[in-house]
Amino acid sequence: MYFILTKDSFKDSPFLKFITVLLPYLHPPVLHLLLLHTNWRKTHKSKHTILYCLVNLLLLAFAVANILSIVALIVDKQKRTDDLLLHSIILPSFFIPPAYLLSTSCCLVPGQIGFTDTGINVIIDILILICPAISLVLVDEKSKYYPYSTAIPSILILVRLFREKCSPPKQSSPPIPTWRVAAFVFILVLAVLVYGLLGSGSIITLYDHFHPPKGADATSS
């Protein structure tokens, strides 16, 4: 929506601006909660109980971090209004890929945990992961192509969805190779870092909103 509509459209409609920012933030918590619901209903052996609970706890924590970010976004109206590009394109390019890859490219069932994609989908997954890093380099160099580079992960995700519709990917069968477990661990650690930063930033924003400095209160009064 940011690239399709003109800046005047957003100026004339605060609601349109809010929806443009909110929709990318809704995607990860929905994926995490659906994944948690699916994983919760799957059976597991008693020896895998600790791992099973840990995975579900992490999924719940990721969803909570995303929900906190939405609350912070709603509360912090000024920042949301000042930088539409940041909240509708740049930040989502970092926190959407881990959620998507965990839900489509990984098996979270204890005893079968691992990265499951094969063929061309592996290349697409790698591109989805490295595009945010490329975006960081471009923004550091103040490249004019930076806004477009941040949209690439979303395009690649659409390509994945189209491929899955046309030809469902083949899943690797047990035993799971070591590299697939390592790839899953990498994606999971990346998710922990991304949603940890997102959640802590949201908590700081909410704390600053509900506990403003005393000088700010005196100035406003």
UniProtKB/Swiss-Prot annotation:
It comes from the Eukaryota. InterPro entries: UPF0328. Belongs to the UPF0328 family. This is UPF0328 protein ECU11_2110. It comes from Encephalitozoon cuniculi (strain GB-M1).
